[in-house]
Amino acid sequence: MPALKGKITVITGGSTGIGLATAKRFVKEGAYVFITGRRQAELDKAVAEIGRNVTAVQGDVSNLDDLDRLYKEVETKKGKLDVLFANAGIVEPKPTAAVSPEHYDKTFDVNARGVFFAVQKALPLMKDGGSIILSGSGVWQKGIPMYPTYGGTKAALRSFVRTWTAEFAGKGIRANVISPGPIETPILEGQFGENTDAMKERFKTMIPMGRIGKPEEVASAAVFLASDESSYITGIDLPVDGGVVAV
């Protein structure tokens, strides 16, 4: 039987990269997926690629009205929610001395505040329990220069999940983090531009498995944490990074 048969799922940041790969896998495993993204053209393309059992809702996770509209759509169409993959996020490398208040606020608004309220507003639809998955990163564990704000937001997500593990257990809701390493996505390209190939080669020297990951490999981990196969797993941070944070 498909791992997610009949499950109603939401994937924020579901129009490209890890989010899109996960949406495709969720549908393949029997789920109905609501995906979000800021750009309607990318959402339309994603829906065409996914092909079935998908609804796209344009919006920005840092905008609480957009989150309300998302969950209203879920409630109207399906009446419940089984899985939330809070995947939307941004990354803009900057050294501490170059971080402006605007950069700081934007990064935390999307990566931390947006995730927090995406979860809060999902709870009324998880009446029968469910699985919450946050998209984290090993950056906060490794202490990598140029990522003080991004790493800070991902550390916040780890803290959220520790709290929610205890807070939501009585409601049958599990909460976990997936922490991807360097993955072949538009975000990776966007960080380094014309230096992307050189940075990929540098990353490979830091990764014990010696290669950049694929979005589909993160999607496989998300399927596991979304499914009943992980029914006794909550509160973890699952690295999908080729061994980066382990050594």
Residue ranges and their predicted role:
Residues 99, 143-152, 163, 191:
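Active-site loop-to-helix junction immediately N-terminal to the catalytic Tyr of the SDR YXXXK motif
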Residues 124-125, 166-170, 231:
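Alpha-helical segment proximal to the catalytic Tyr-Lys
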